[in-house]
From Swiss-Prot:
CDD domains assigned: Anticodon_Ia_Val (cd07962)
Primary residence: cytoplasm
Subcellular locations according to the entry: Cytoplasm
GO molecular function term, any single one: aminoacyl-tRNA deacylase activity
Domain notes for this protein: ValRS has two distinct active sites: one for aminoacylation and one for editing. The misactivated threonine is translocated from the active site to the editing site.
Subunit note: Monomer.
Protein name: Valine--tRNA ligase
SUPFAM superfamilies: Anticodon-binding domain of a subclass of class I aminoacyl-tRNA synthetases, Nucleotidylyl transferase, ValRS/IleRS/LeuRS editing domain
Keywords of the record: Aminoacyl-tRNA synthetase, ATP-binding, Cytoplasm, Ligase, Nucleotide-binding, Protein biosynthesis
Amino acid sequence: MTEFPKNYNFTENEKKWQQIWQAQQIYAYDPNISKEETYVVDTPPPTVSGQLHIGHVYSYTQTDFIVRFQRMIGKNIFYPMGFDDNGLPTERLVEKQKQIKAYNMGRDEFIKICEEVVESEEEKFRRLFNQIALSVDWSLEYQTISPLSRKISQMSFLDLVKKGKIYRNDQPILWDPVDGTALAQADIEDKAKTSFMNYIIFKTEQGESLTIATTRPELLPACIAVFYHPDDKRYKHLACKSAITPLFNEKVPLLASPLVQQDKGTGLVMCCTFGDQTDITWWKTHNLPLKTIITKKGTINFPHNIAIDGLKIKEARIKIIDILKEQKLITKQEEITQTVKCAERSGAPLEILTVPQWFVKTISHKEALLKRANELNWRPNNMKIRLENWINAISWDWCISRQRYFGVPFPVWYSKRVGEEGKILYADISQLPVDPLKDLPIGYSKEEVEPDLDVMDTWATSSVSPQLSTHCISDNFAVNKDRHNKLFPMDLRPQAHEIIRTWAFYTILKAHLHQNTLPWGNIMVSGWCLAEDRSKMSKSKGNVLVPEKLLEQYGSDVIRYWSANSKLGADTAYSEDVMKNGKRLVNKLWNACKFIFIHCNKLKDVDKKASLFDIKEQITNEFDQWMINKLVELVNAATNELQNYEYANAMHLTEKFFWVIFCDNYLEISKTRSYDEENKNPQGQYSSILTLYHVMQILLKLFAPFIPHITEELYQILYSENSIHVKGNWVNYGDLHYGIDVTQSEGLIAILDIVRKFKAENNLSIKAPIKLLEVSGIELSAELTEDLKNVTSAEEIQFEGQGDKIKVNVIF
């Protein structure tokens, strides 16, 4: 190029380079390269469940920093993109977008609408991810609802069935009455809600009054026992007696249990099927009867009492309380704040129903999973405790059944054949993927089977996201075993911290159960993107940032710069100031390269193409040599930080070096020598230009993982027609060093700082001429003295001996 472009138009250039990178397949994975030379990423498949937001940009770019670095140090990169486009989150999006309800229409019709919405939403993701320059190989893309993914997911199910790690049982489960489906423990969240503690009068068979405190009087028809603590002296006399429930006059046993909290309420607790997990424990332990009064729709089913039959739960609670008050069976009510288990998606309070479901054995593997958590490299390490706390808190096996439509079906039927009614029939591996509503088990007719109508929890499929890319579950359930062996276990799982208890946990569980291994060696956990006031972004607050607007205003590189300024794992507020700093950096890089472009035609082509090792002897000036030493220190430090996934530290070191050491000091100090207008020092000029040229080349490479467009543009203008982002284009000058006295160059900078401060305090131009500089505390070499005279505009410099502290007297 004979002329440096006048301006940098980020809109045009970013789009240009994105198209070129795709066309040249810069980011393509090579399946012929060994596992040892390959870096494999288990990319988070974004949930197709709503609007794109700045949080997507924030977390995905942080992964891309590491991936680009690994590619540049020579790794073959397997970096796919997937879409988690099945399950309840997607169904809720479709219902909201189309103003429909799944249960009000045919299953096939609803699934077809889901597929149409998913296709449109995924295209938005692709467009955004290309705009922010994620260096994924799009040929590796997968969808969790695709035929291949359904096959892999069903393989996972059958493999765990074969291994005895999955079972079906009619047992109490968490139920969301709004979405009409069973949920797993990880799908719930605790919410603080205001309620009332109602003190209700029961009687013993002998007529003794007992007061029981409860927040759920609507469950009185399902009361099966009353419990007290065995050490509670108030109630020891109740042993072997029975109580009579108010209103319904049912006789229930009075039983002792250490699970009762003596200081809560009255110390007497009614056990119902089911109010909470303690009720389940008592029901199982004491072999109590089952009374089910709550329906899947969250209404009361109790035809014996028409006053509450058919009412919604809250309505039934109010009605029961009114009747109890009428009959003077409530002694008092206390307003309380209690923790209620709610569905994470719908927000509805959960019920506990007894429904046949599929479960993955989890509780029995808690100790093994804690060991797995410790084997994993956590980035940052303090995130490990979140998984450990979750594993310790697990009290339910993983329920993977969902009573929805748009998901991966269970490859299961139930026999109606005479003599084997209810027998579970599993699909053969050759049939996968199967839809039991349309397909049949081998050897059975349609009339002989009942299909399983449920679909799998979306986490049951996304928990095998590594295997969705490797196309294999285990030795016995594989589509491509060779591909799997080359890619699994993977190197990196990047994800957000709020899904450690779901995606991270379930993926670790599945890999442990399938192949007795970890799914990856490293987990990189990102924080949240917060609003500028550090509050959580939400539509209700109106503070959600739309990426498209920011991209239009600032461009991809500036947004990536903002993301790179956030330490891994930390919650970070969006900042206009940081965005502006990113814009300044892009402009400064452009202008610095423009200056170098002016001079680089003075260099020999062979020296331009050479490495620093090859041209070491041609960098003759002491200050230039100091600059190269500092550059090598930077390269080593930034490389070390990126190898440890500390991208923010690497970015900070590089940026500080560029602004302070390179631009503010080196470039200004060497500028006169670079021009050498009077041809006084041709050797010094060549040394300076050579240093400028190669230092900037390396700085562009260090910046490349973070701001890929501007670095590519400048790299192509100054250095090469090949992409800066190609495999193996990092730098390594670990043992390159000039044996110079560093105090000399650092002394030069210290003197310059003093002079600059003096001129600023006296409102003088930085170029204002100085008659004499009197310097004490150091004596610079002739070379450095000449550079100092040039940069300070000093006619003469006098050194007045060595000392502990540098002092400068400026004389005009």
